[in-house]
A protein has these predicted regions:
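Acidic, glycine-rich two-metal-ion catalytic cores of nucleic acid-processing enzymes
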Residues: 134-228
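N-terminal leader/targeting and assembly helices and adjacent pre-domain segments
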Residues: 1-147, 151-155, 159, 163, ...
């Protein structure tokens, strides 16, 4: 059973993640651009794929930043990385720059999954006769989810090094769209360094990190960090 604090804050995180981190308006704008792109022949699409990749990269950077912010709130700490990057809103008077470990962020965003990076998958679909806008949207949503949760892991790792005793709990969306393998993990708490293990033999440090890509696509789960 989730505590009131876990339920309320997780609800906020889920709401932000599903309705704010990638807003419907943002996805609608991207979908319109993608539809225009995929109306072109593959040879012409190759000329504009870099623009879309840059736009997707901006989205993933924000996912990493949001994950850092939420993880700090979960643990009641402020992991202050040595590097900082400029992002939207940092020119506003009185607003501090977002601070993240840029090396960690780049490593997470550029992670190879099933032998390819997200960039390579986007390029493949743009070069394919069978590519569709939905294929790219699926990449954006899946990668955003992975980057967000991996960002939370990065803060958890740093906190565990500093104080020890960091644990993580797996939470699902508690609806009929949740996979049975993920429902199996609902509420499970493990030490930060351990993996979550499903009944089908797969495992992950966090949602979006399973060995089987089919366990990652369209996943909406999240982790909650605590110190004990």
């Amino acid at each position: 059973m989730r505590s009131w604090t876990e339920q309320s804050v997780c609800g906020r995180i889920f709401y932000l993640h599903m309705n704010g981190l990638i807003s419907k308006d943002e996805l609608n704008v991207m979908s319109e651009r993608l539809r225009a792109d995929f109306a072109l022949p593959p040879d012409e699409r190759k000329r504009i794929v870099k623009d879309r990749i840059d736009e997707i990269l901006d989205i993933l950077i924000m996912q990493y930043i949001y994950g850092n912010e939420d993880a700090n709130e979960m643990l009641g700490i402020n992991v202050d990385w040595s590097e900082q990057i400029g992002t939207e809103g940092t020119d506003t008077p009185g607003t501090e720059p977002y601070r993240v470990d840029t090396n960690r962020m780049e490593s997470v965003i550029n992670q190879i999954v099933a032998d390819k990076t997200w960039r390579q998958r986007v390029e493949d679909w743009y070069a394919s006769d069978n590519g569709t806008p939905d294929d790219i949207i699926r990449i954006i949503e899946t990668e955003s989810h992975r980057v967000y949760n991996d960002s939370i892991l990065d803060v958890g790792e740093q906190a565990d090094k500093e104080t020890g005793g960091v644990y993580k709990t797996w939470f699902t969306m508690l609806d009929d769209r949740v996979r049975e393998t993920h429902e199996y993990l609902e509420g499970e708490t493990v030490p930060y360094k351990e993996k979550f293990h499903t009944f089908d033999g797969d495992s992950a440090m966090a949602p979006g990190g399973f060995s089987d890509p089919q366990n990652n696509i369209n996943c909406r789960c999240a982790i909650w960090l605590t110190r004990q």
